[in-house]
């Protein structure tokens, strides 16, 4: 057996050498520099080890190779872009030349084939994007949801006041509660178990795993999708089946629940209901899948980036008390010490606005941006970006470039304010949410929610590390990155501020939750 393997390997190596010797000389410009390609597998062994923050690993390419570098895996060229201006030129200004979505076999196996990250049916992709743009793609559209945001954020303050040690849980719950209310008209359980909320959280965690770069061998060797699950090394088949069951339930349960409500005459306003009433959707049709995935994208896309940004904000406030003090001083001066700011105050709060930008710059929610595929050969700075190459922007290097941002590792909102002798530094909103037609459609949700949470949290709480000597936390690897464990003290500024936080209980008492109804619906339809 071993001799057969050696003979096969030798034959493949011989064919590879023969191909290189006999191939006609390529007169095109060279690819961007990069690590040496090994025969057959190329740079497969040059990907970051598991558990390594991918953006830091690839940032080393900028040090070694400059603003662009290249790799190759099984014939697939990968171009790492480590310079913000280059990224804007290639993927935004020339977005029509690189708007294709990379193939992701594992994501399709795991049931995510209709996601905006993978959907290659151009019409379906355009429909989902258009629906999202209409509902949440502009600040004007988002403004219709401001009252819901304000109530949800005040409830977040109350949860944090009552149980500050569970801050991360409260951040996640608030983010998902808002998106599920907007998308489905669904009210989550304020306390206790909620099947639909749990299902959404499970899907978000699986999303990060599914799309983690270099995680799945089947993405490099698509033929492996046909290997049975019992075959050695094919455990990805079992994972794919598990993830597929989760996402099918997460997308279909709220859709069927709303259809059931319509039939019973008790439906509530929601994005899904509005879209459902616009047309007829046959059960199991492609149009129905486009509809349910539109709303799945609303919920997951608008919540995970918000959780990351808000978590980073709280860490920054604990690590940089002087920034927290300046933000509080501005709020007390402009809004009042015991009054909560509203969205209408934003233009009067330049330091808070700069603070929001600095959160996005300091640690982008998605440190590696969404990949693009080139649709034709392109030449940049004397290097070839061949047709079909995968473009991968390292957003973290964009936001930590010392030639663009002074002291990039330091959290400093003042960098975005007009100075006597210096103009504001580059607004990170130009690239932290992606480029061109693949820009994050939920970016305004995250931006506006972070603004109001920052205002309310700084107005009402003192935020500090439990251990004053604790180092800055590590940020966890993944498509959406969040800070690692970092214990905080979050305490009310005064009894008056505690009373202000608790006023939500009388201003907007908890509504009846839908958790019991959805659990009964799922049990009745055997969806648990």
Swiss-Prot record:
Belongs to the cytochrome P450 family. It comes from the Eukaryota. This is O-methylsterigmatocystin oxidoreductase. It catalyses: 8-O-methylsterigmatocystin + 2 reduced [NADPH--hemoprotein reductase] + 2 O2 = aflatoxin B1 + methanol + 2 oxidized [NADPH--hemoprotein reductase] + CO2 + H2O + 2 H(+); 8-O-methyldihydrosterigmatocystin + 2 reduced [NADPH--hemoprotein reductase] + 2 O2 = aflatoxin B2 + methanol + 2 oxidized [NADPH--hemoprotein reductase] + CO2 + H2O + 2 H(+). Transmembrane segments: none annotated. It holds the Pfam family p450. The lineage of its organism: Eukaryota, Fungi, Dikarya, Ascomycota, Pezizomycotina. Its EC number is 1.14.14.117. Its cofactor is heme. It comes from Aspergillus flavus (strain ATCC MYA-384 / AF70). Keywords: Heme, Iron, Metal-binding, Monooxygenase, Oxidoreductase. The keyword Oxidoreductase applies. Heme binds at residue 440. GO terms for molecular function: aflatoxin B synthase activity; heme binding; iron ion binding. Pathway: Mycotoxin biosynthesis; aflatoxin biosynthesis. Converts O-methylsterigmatocystin (OMST) to aflatoxin B1 and converts dihydro-O-methylsterigmatocystin (DHOMST) to aflatoxin B2 in the aflatoxin biosynthesis pathway.
